Amino acid sequence: MPPIYVLQQGAKLCINNRRLCIEYEGETLTSVPLAHVSQVVLFGNISLTTPAIDALLAQNCEVVFLSQRGGFRGRLV
């Protein structure tokens, strides 16, 4: 599965029914079955719920944090 890139500033990643959901201003922009996620790349001001972090780590998904312009900030493995 290719990485999931999230660029929408202010977006939030959460888990709903074993799906990784990307929400913005209370609306779900998209969702992907958690089983199809191998890596998530976040650009800038993106938040993750604790259940999303737990689910991604349990699935051995890498989460990469970048600045809005793509500078490396860190990662969860």
Where are these regions (language model features)?
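N-terminal intrinsically disordered, cationic/polar leader segments
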Residues: 1-77
